[in-house]
Amino acid sequence: MDRTRRLRQTAVMRSMVRENHVRTEELIYPLFVMEGENIVQPVESMPGICQYSVDRMNEELDRVKALQIPAILIFGIPEHKDEVGSGAYDEHGIVQTAIRRIKKDYPDLLVIADVCLCEYTSHGHCGLIRDGIILNDETLPLLAQTAVSYARAGADIIAPSDMMDKRVGAIRQALDAAGFTYTCLLYTSPSPRDRSV
């Protein structure tokens, strides 16, 4: 026998099991920025989503603001990749450059910055590799350095999506030590679609 009345006993219980209402002010828009100029490149795995060069991203951000979406999650696509993902923590990297521009042109937009090395490494993994083994502990300082550089550029929230153990603690400690005690951390689940960009 189906007894749904069990789920209607209290206001809290009803609130927890009722239908969801998605509103634009609760959405976060993904923004993929790439190096280069005058680029708007569709992402095949995500219809309606494009990669933008910094000089063209405001076209999309104007649409985001018009829709009253209050936040973006920014992903970088660098031209240069190397074994240690140095583009991720380069103070003049693509994400850092884009964040500074966004905060200048759209100061009220909440900027969430994805932290992972996979897009910046020549091997495509989110950690350093030696002899075919991912070096977890050696990767943590690079992730922390990336997070601090994003915060320094103006990111409101740091969103680690890598798969290194103890990354959140390492990032939090580095942010605090650099004076970014009020910069928040938000977990983002790695998505095969994000990784296909």
Predicted region positions:
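N-terminal amphipathic alpha-helix/helix-capping segment at the start of soluble metabolic enzymes
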Residues: 1-32, 39
